[in-house]
Structure formats: structure tokens, C-alpha cells
Amino acid sequence: MSDQPGTSRPPLRAEPTPTKTATRRRARPIAIPSDETPRNEVTFLRPSEVPQRKPLPEYREPQPRKTVPKNVPLEDLHNYHREECLNVSIPHFINTEDLIKESQRVNGLISFRSTNFVDPSVILKEIKKKEEETVTLMDNDKNSIIDIVGDGINYEKLKKVEKSLCQIDIITEFMNRSRHLQGKKVNGCIMRIDETKQLLFHVIIDGPVGSIYEGGTFFADINIQPYQNHSLIPRVCFHTFIFHPNLGKYGNWDMRGIQWERRSNLEVLYNFIVEGMRNVKYDIERRNLAQLEDMSQPNISRLAKEDWPKFERTAREFVMKMAGGTINGRKTIFAETKKRRRQDFLDEDIDVIGIS
């Protein structure tokens, strides 16, 4: 190269080949404008420096209710409506459909309140007449008449008293219908009334003759509970285990299907339980799979449906073990004490988890 100054040509730029196109993406802005930069400073202002907001508009209390004069035509109701008025009362009755038609005719909002005009003196007379009524109640225990006369009658308390007295009537009628069964064996069942608890009966049930539970003695409690519609609901709880699909985990017998009425007595319960023990095979055969799963012990009901000989053999074994049954005419160890309740089974669950 020469050190002498001279003219030189600028370097030639390389032209892009036509086959390749260079694409350049637009750079994403990363700088935050100065007016939008976050401020982390905390500034303490004096009370005089705090900016004051604009005062709220003055509140105007709406006018009291406005009453339309009596017998105003329906076409003139819209003349009495004002925005500053709280409510507009109509002293005579107007059908809602007529108000809707009037609103459509006026092409506006109708906000009237339609009320029936009643003379206050008539209402006052009705109230006094109601308070002066004498309510007579018959007490079943003391056979006395209770007179409750007006001046501050508590009608809610009065309804509770009537309900309790009605329940007493139902309980007394049931006890009178069932008391003759005490100490008598009816359909293989004998009961004793619990003197400490009302409507509690201790029952001893003999296994039905000809059934798979024959020879066993089963102890149960029958509890009658009042219900809200002036009726009684029976509940049966066994203290002796029965290999039966209607017996629940805690000894409760399934009461669905019982023909129980207000005039029923304990004999209806006896027949229902005994027939359920005697006709267990027929009851299982007529049920479908969903009904078997709905029973108290689905595993036992499935066994009875699929393998009846095994179910029958297992049920007889439990009768001999738990209910003092007999083997070939000879009494087992538990048969000697079959009339005495076994206390060691009172507080235990009698559920069968698996069957081998």
C-alpha cells in the first residue's frame, strides 16, 4: 500500500442472494416510560396536604307515603305517581292484570301498591273476640278441665300442650291394646313390660317350628316411639344373633314391609318377625339383585340366593352356638340357659363381615 493520499473507492456491499430472505423481528420494548415507573417511596402528608374529595350531593329524604283518594279511576292513577314520593297506596282493590294493562297503555313504570281498605274497628273487634274465647282441654291423668281465658294467650304453647296430650292418648290406647299379651305366649313370643321405661318391651322369641331357626331362643327389645303425625313407630332390636339378611349390624330388625296402623298392637309385630324368620327362603327367591343389595346384610342375602344349602347350614350352626339350639334331640351347653339373657352379647356388634 502507498502512504500517498489518493482517491479510493468505498468497499462494495454484499448483496443478499435472491434465494434467501432475511427476517428481522421487532425488538420488544424493555424500558418502562418514566411516567409509569413504580414508586416505592412512602410519603407522609400533613393533614392540610391530604387532598379533599368533592362533597356528596345533598341527601333528600323521600316524602312519606301518598294515598290516592278513594274510587279514583284506573286511567288517572299515573297522575298521582311522583319520583320524589316513597310509596303510593291505593285504598281499594285493583286486579294485577288491570295494572299491567294500564302500564302498557301509559308506556311507563307503574309502582303503585294496591291494598284492601279495611275498617280498623272491625279488626279490633275480631281481635277482642279471639282473646275472649275459652279453650277447654281435658287432662287424661287428673281428669280435670283447664280453662284458658284470653288476655295474652300463648297459642304456640297451647299447640304444644295439645300435641303432648294427643300423644298421651295414643300411648295409652296402645298400652291398653297390648297389656293383655304380657306373660302370654302368642305365636311363639312372650313379652314383659319394662316398668322403668315407657313403651319398652322385653320379648323372648322361640324359633318357628319347621324353619331353619327351630330350637333357638332369641331375646329382643321392642321400642315404640311416637311420630309427628299422631302415630307410633315400632323398632325391634335383637340381643341374640340371627344369621338372617334382615338383621342389621347393631341388631336392628328391618321393619320395611310391615302392615302397621294406628290400631295395631304387639301381636302384629310378633307375626311380622316370626313370618320373616319362617319364610326367609321365599323372601330371598322373589328378590332381584338390587333388592338383595338393599337388605340389611347384603353378603348374607347373596349367599342365600346363590348357595341356599350353605346358608341353611350356617344358620343352623349359629342357632346352636348363639341361641341355645339342639343337636339330634340333645341339648347343647347354651340350651341349658336358653331362658336367661346372655349379657356378654348385649354391647357387641352382631355383624358378619365375611363368610367362609
Swiss-Prot record:
**A GO CC annotation given for this chain:** dendrite
- PROSITE patterns per record: UBC_2
- Any one Gene Ontology BP term: DNA damage response
Which locations, inside or outside the cell, does it occupy?
Answer: Nucleus; Cytoplasm; Cell projection, Dendrite; Cell projection, Axon
Keyword Cytoplasm among UniProt keywords? yes
The UniProt GO MF terms for this protein read: ubiquitin conjugating enzyme activity
Please list the residue ranges annotated as the UBC core domain. 169-324
Segments spanning the bilayer are none
**Biased composition, Basic and acidic residues: where in the chain?**
63-76
In Pfam terms, one family for this protein is UQ_con
Location (main, coarse): nucleus
User: Highest taxon of the source?
Assistant: Eukaryota
Keywords, in A-Z order: Cell projection, Cytoplasm, Nucleus, Ubl conjugation pathway
Q: Locate the region Disordered.
A: 1-83
Give the tissue specificity.
Expressed ubiquitously.
UniProt biased composition (Polar residues)? 18-32
Protein family per UniProt: Belongs to the ubiquitin-conjugating enzyme family.
- What is its biological role? Possible negative regulator of polyubiquitination. May modulate the activity of the p38 MAP kinase pnk-3. May have a role in axon termination and synaptic transmission at motor and mechanosensory neurons. Plays a role in intraflagellar transport in cilia and cilium length regulation.
Q: How does it assemble?
A: May interact with pmk-3.
Q: What is this protein called?
A: Ubiquitin-conjugating enzyme E2 variant 3
